[in-house]
């Protein structure tokens, strides 16, 4: 059955198949009985899998990184599939279309995809409102703070933030600050994305002084909140040893 479905889906553009598949899952999960069945099949019932990292209690250590659910549209469905956490984004202050299509390519022999999306997303205002609605539906207060006690393992949501393509690097810190403020009540942790090769000039923000400015502003905001959030940094895999040392010094 899988091989048959795969061969049919491979007849269509990769990005279209992604959204088609997730929308089908969304329809299925809108039926309570079907969603309960999916959850029963996929959500592991093993307390030994719960983990505490960066001050957060995860149901299990298997999560989904940013890029799959950029706009926080499929949180209920991904939780039903058993993920312990999902990272939404990358989110930018303004909506942007991303790079021209096609921008997602299959490598069948490697069972992999090449991603050249370019931070396409609905913009932080729309995504923050979506997360606010999710928070209310899932037992959180109006401002996003969980009603669950902090020691109870739960489904964790991360927010991956970046800058708009039109924003000059000298002002990039403002974009990260806007996203941080808007998403802060509704996500459990942040990822500062300065590593994507699909946004021109973004990797230049990994340079020490540029990165210092971004992180300094975010830390100031975070420290002023009643509930601070962990801040993680996403860097490129090909940094030099000296560049890595600079990043570690800033952290």
Annotate each language-model stretch with its function.
Residues 2-51, 115-120, 124:
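An N-cap/entry alpha-helix motif that binds or orients negatively charged groups
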């Amino acid at each position: 059955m899988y091989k048959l479905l795969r061969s049919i889906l491979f007849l269509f553009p990769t990005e279209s198949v992604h959204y088609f598949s997730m929308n089908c899952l969304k329809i299925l999960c809108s039926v309570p009985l079907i969603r309960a069945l999916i959850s029963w099949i996929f959500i592991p019932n093993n307390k030994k899998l719960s983990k505490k990292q960066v001050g957060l209690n995860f149901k299990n250590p298997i999560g989904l990184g940013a890029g799959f659910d950029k706009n926080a549209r499929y949180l209920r469905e991904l939780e039903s599939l058993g993920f312990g956490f999902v990272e939404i984004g990358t989110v930018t202050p303004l909506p942007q279309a991303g790079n021209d299509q096609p921008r997602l390519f299959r490598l069948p022999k490697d069972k992999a995809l090449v991603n050249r999306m370019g931070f396409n997303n609905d913009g932080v205002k729309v995504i923050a409102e979506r997360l606010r609605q999710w928070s209310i539906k899932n037992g959180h207060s109006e401002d996003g703070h969980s009603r669950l006690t902090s020691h109870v393992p739960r489904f964790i949501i991360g927010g991956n933030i970046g800058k708009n393509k039109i924003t000059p690097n000298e002002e990039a810190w403002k974009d990260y600050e806007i996203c941080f403020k808007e998403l802060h009540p509704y996500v459990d942790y942040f990822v500062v994305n300065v590593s994507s090769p699909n946004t021109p000039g973004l990797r230049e923000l990994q340079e020490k002084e540029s990165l210092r400015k971004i992180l300094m502003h975010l830390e100031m905001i975070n420290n002023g909140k009643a509930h601070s959030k962990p801040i993680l940094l996403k860097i490129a895999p090909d940094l030099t040893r000296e560049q890595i040392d600079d990043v570690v010094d800033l952290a």
